[in-house]
C-alpha cells in the first residue's frame, strides 16, 4: 500500500511498458518504482535504448504504461480520458525537447503563446507573459522571428519559454543540450538551474553524465530497469510554500469563460488554417479547383435551367396562357375530324356567356400567299374573332387590332406579325399600317402589327390574321369553325374549367365529338421536362463536386501526415482532441468555402459570356441557388474533412512527436 507524502509530485509504482513487435511483445520498462518530490532536480541517465525516453513520456502523460500505477500530485492517471490527460500536461508540465519542436509558421512569440491558448488565457495576458518570458531568456530582440531565423540555442530558449508559459511546476527536458554546441548547452543548463532555484521540479533525460551531474539526484536506467538512484548534492531551492507563487502565474490571472475560450481557440485554429494554406498555395489551389468547378457547374446549370424555363414561358405566352382550345374529332390524328361539322359559331357565343369564361374566339384557317409589289410569300391565313388577341396575350405595336365591327362586317382588316415586316417590306422603314397587300385574290388593308409570333417561333411559315367571318366567306366558303379558343378567368382552375366546358358541349351536341387541348397541361409538361433536365444536368455537376470533395479528403490526409509532428507538439502543450479535430476540420471547410465562393463567381461569369455572345437563352441566377451552393460546399468540407481531422485528433502524442 503506497503511503502518500505531501511533497510527492510524481509517483510511479510497478510501471511496465510493452510494445508489440509482430506477434511478440518487447518490454521496454520493467517494474519501475520511482518517487520524485516537489522541487527536486532529477537526471535520468542511460544509454540509447535503455528506456529513459519512454520513462519520460510516461512521466509527462505523453504515453500510458501497460501496467502499474502513476500519480501526479496525488491524482491517479490510470482511468483518465485523453482530454483529462491533456489538462494534466497543460497545467502541470512543461516540455523541453532535443529537437525544439517549434512550429515553423509561427514567430517566437506565437510559439510561446500556444500553451496559454489551450489554457483559456486572455490574449492580452498571454501576450504580455510570453514577451516577458522571452525577454527574461535573452530573446527580446527575436520576438517576431520565425524558427528558421534563429540559431539552435535561440530555438531552445524559445522552447524553454513555451514550457514556462503556463507556469508548469514540472519541467521535463529530453536531451536539452543534445543538438547544441557547448556554449549554448551550458547556457540552457544555467537556465534550468535558475528554474530549479525558483522551486520547480526539473527532470532531465540525458546520456551525458556531465549534464546529469548538474542535478541533485541521478537515476540510472539500463534495459528498462532502474539500477541506481543516487543523491548527488543537497537541494538549494526556495522553501516549500514559496515555490511558483510568482505574480506572473497565469493560473492566478483571470482566464476566459468557456465560450470566449472556445472562440479564442477557434480563432487560433482559423489563423493556423490560413497559414497552412498559404504555405502550400499551389496545392491549396489545386485542391480548391475541384470544388470551384463543381460549384460553378451547379450554379451555371441551375441558372441555365431557370433561363430555359423562362424562355419557354415567354414563348408559351404567345400560344395563350390559361386557355382551352376546342377541336373537332377525338384527337389531332382522328381521320374523321374533317367530316365533323358540329362545331359552329353558336357554340362560341354560348361559351362566352359562361361565368368562368373571360373571352372566346372562333378560329378558321386557310393556306394562301401574301404579295406586296414584287414580294410574294406563302402564308397561313388565320381567321379569328376580336377577342383572339386578348386570349393569346398579344398586343399591337403599330396601328390597331380589328374589333367586333370588323368581324360583323366581314372586313378585310389585316393584322400581321412584326417579323413579317422584314419579309414583305425589306427595303422600307415606313409604317406598314394603311398599306394594301394581296392575300390570295383578296386585297386587304394592314390595320395593325402584333409584337410577337403566335406560333412561338416554332414555324417558318408566315401567319397573318383576318376576321374569321372574312375567312369563312372569302377563303374557305363555309360557316363552320375549325377551332374555338376559350380564355378562362384568372381565378378559375383550368382543369376544373376544362371538365365543365366538356360537359357543357356534350349537352349541346348530344355526344363528345370534340376534344379539348388545355394550355396549362401543355405548360406543366414542358415545366416538368425542363425541371427533370435541370436536375439531371445539376446531378452531373454535383458528382464533379463530390469528386472535388474526395480530392479535399486526400489532400487533408496528406496534410495530417505532413504535420503529424505539429499535432504532437500541440497535444504535448495541452491541446484537447477536440482542438486538433477543430484545427484540421476548419482547414478543410475553409478550402471548400473559399473554393465555393470562387466557384460562384466563376458560375456568374459564365452568364456574362452568354450575354456577350448574344445567346438566345440568358442564364438567370437566384439567391437561393447561390446560398444552397455555398452551403453544399461547406457540407463537402465537413463531410470529407471530418475523417482526416478525426484521424489527427486520435493520434497518440508520443507517436506524433516521434515522427520527423
From Swiss-Prot:
Non-canonical ABC transporter that contains transmembrane domains (TMD), which form a pore in the inner membrane, and an ATP-binding domain (NBD), which is responsible for energy generation. Confers resistance against macrolides. Belongs to the ABC transporter superfamily. Macrolide exporter (TC 3.A.1.122) family. It comes from the Bacteria. It is found in: Cell inner membrane. ATP binds at residues 46-53. It comes from Bartonella quintana (strain Toulouse) (Rochalimaea quintana). Its EC number is 7.6.2.-. Keywords: Antibiotic resistance, ATP-binding, Cell inner membrane, Cell membrane, Membrane, Nucleotide-binding, Translocase, Transmembrane, Transmembrane helix, Transport. SUPFAM superfamilies: P-loop containing nucleoside triphosphate hydrolases (SSF52540). PANTHER family: MACROLIDE EXPORT ATP-BINDING_PERMEASE PROTEIN MACB, MEMBRANE COMPONENT OF TRANSPORTER-RELATED. The keyword Cell inner membrane applies. The chain crosses the membrane at residues 285-305, 532-552, 593-613, 625-645. This is Macrolide export ATP-binding/permease protein MacB. GO terms for cellular component: plasma membrane.
Amino acid at each position: 500500500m503506497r503511503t502518500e507524502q505531501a511533497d510527492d509530485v510524481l509517483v510511479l509504482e510497478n510501471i511496465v511498458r510493452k510494445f508489440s513487435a509482430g506477434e511478440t511483445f518487447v518490454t521496454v520498462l520493467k517494474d519501475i518504482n520511482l518517487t520524485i518530490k516537489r522541487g527536486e532536480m532529477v537526471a535520468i541517465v542511460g544509454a540509447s535504448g535503455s528506456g529513459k525516453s519512454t520513462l519520460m513520456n510516461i512521466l509527462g502523460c505523453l504515453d500510458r504504461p501497460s501496467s502499474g500505477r502513476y500519480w501526479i500530485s496525488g491524482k491517479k492517471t490510470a482511468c483518465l480520458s485523453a482530454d483529462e490527460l491533456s489538462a494534466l500536461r497543460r497545467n502541470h508540465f512543461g516540455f523541453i525537447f532535443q529537437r525544439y519542436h517549434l512550429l515553423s509558421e509561427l514567430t517566437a512569440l506565437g510559439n510561446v503563446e500556444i500553451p496559454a491558448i489551450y489554457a483559456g488565457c486572455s490574449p492580452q495576458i498571454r501576450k504580455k507573459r510570453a514577451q516577458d518570458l522571452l525577454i527574461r531568456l535573452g530573446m527580446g530582440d527575436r520576438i517576431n522571428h520565425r524558427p528558421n531565423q534563429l540559431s539552435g540555442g535561440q530555438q531552445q530558449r524559445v522552447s524553454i519559454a513555451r514550457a514556462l508559459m503556463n507556469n508548469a511546476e514540472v519541467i521535463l527536458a529530453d536531451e536539452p543540450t543534445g543538438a547544441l554546441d557547448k556554449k549554448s548547452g551550458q547556457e540552457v543548463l544555467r537556465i534550468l538551474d535558475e528554474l530549479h532555484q525558483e522551486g520547480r521540479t526539473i527532470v532531465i533525460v540525458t546520456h551525458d553524465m556531465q549534464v546529469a551531474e548538474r542535478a541533485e539526484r541521478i537515476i540510472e536506467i539500463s534495459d528498462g530497469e532502474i539500477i541506481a538512484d543516487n543523491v548527488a548534492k543537497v537541494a538549494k531551492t526556495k522553501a516549500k510554500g514559496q515555490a511558483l507563487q510568482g505574480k506572473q502565474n497565469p493560473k492566478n490571472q483571470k482566464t476566459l469563460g468557456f465560450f470566449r475560450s472556445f472562440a479564442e481557440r477557434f480563432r487560433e485554429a482559423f489563423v493556423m488554417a490560413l497559414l497552412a494554406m498559404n504555405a502550400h498555395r499551389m496545392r491549396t489551389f489545386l485542391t480548391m479547383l475541384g470544388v470551384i468547378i463543381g460549384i460553378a457547374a451547379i450554379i451555371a446549370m441551375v441558372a441555365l435551367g431557370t433561363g430555359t424555363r423562362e424562355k419557354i414561358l415567354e414563348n408559351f405566352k404567345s400560344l395563350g396562357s390559361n386557355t382551352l382550345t376546342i377541336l373537332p374529332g377525338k384527337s389531332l390524328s382522328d381521320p374523321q375530324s374533317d367530316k365533323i361539322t358540329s362545331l359552329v359559331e353558336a357554340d362560341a357565343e354560348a361559351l362566352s356567356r359562361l361565368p368562368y369564361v373571360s373571352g372566346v374566339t372562333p378560329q378558321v384557317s386557310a393556306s394562301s400567299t401574301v404579295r406586296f409589289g414584287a414580294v410574294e410569300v406563302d402564308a397561313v391565313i388565320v381567321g379569328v374573332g376580336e377577342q383572339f388577341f386578348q386570349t393569346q396575350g398579344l398586343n399591337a405595336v403599330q396601328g390597331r387590332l380589328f374589333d367586333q365591327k370588323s368581324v360583323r362586317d366581314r372586313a378585310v382588316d389585316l393584322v400581321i406579325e412584326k417579323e413579317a415586316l422584314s419579309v414583305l417590306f425589306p427595303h422600307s422603314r415606313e409604317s406598314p399600317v394603311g398599306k394594301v397587300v394581296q392575300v390570295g385574290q383578296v386585297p386587304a388593308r394592314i390595320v395593325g402589327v402584333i409584337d410577337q409570333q403566335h406560333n412561338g417561333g416554332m414555324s417558318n411559315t408566315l401567319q397573318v390574321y383576318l376576321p374569321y367571318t372574312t375567312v369563312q366567306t372569302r377563303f374557305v366558303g363555309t360557316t363552320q369553325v375549325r377551332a374555338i379558343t376559350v380564355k378562362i378567368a384568372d381565378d378559375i382552375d383550368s382543369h376544373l374549367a376544362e371538365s365543365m366546358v366538356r360537359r357543357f358541349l356534350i349537352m349541346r351536341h348530344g355526344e363528345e365529338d370534340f376534344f379539348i387541348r388545355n394550355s396549362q397541361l401543355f405548360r406543366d409538361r414542358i415545366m416538368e421536362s425542363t425541371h427533370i433536365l435541370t436536375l439531371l444536368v445539376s446531378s452531373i455537376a454535383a458528382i464533379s463536386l463530390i469528386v472535388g470533395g474526395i480530392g479535399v479528403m486526400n489532400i487533408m490526409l496528406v496534410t495530417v501526415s505532413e504535420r503529424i509532428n505539429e499535432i504532437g507538439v500541440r497535444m504535448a502543450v495541452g491541446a484537447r482532441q477536440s482542438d486538433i479535430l477543430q484545427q484540421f476540420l476548419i482547414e478543410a471547410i475553409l478550402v471548400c468555402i473559399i473554393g465555393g465562393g470562387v466557384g460562384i463567381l466563376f458560375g456568374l461569369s459564365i452568364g456574362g459570356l452568354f450575354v456577350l455572345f448574344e445567346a438566345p437563352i440568358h442564364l438567370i441566377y437566384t439567391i437561393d441557388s447561390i446560398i444552397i451552393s455555398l452551403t453544399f460546399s461547406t457540407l463537402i468540407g465537413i463531410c470529407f474533412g471530418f475523417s482526416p481531422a478525426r484521424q489527427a485528433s486520435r493520434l497518440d502524442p508520443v507517436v506524433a512527436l516521434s515522427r520527423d
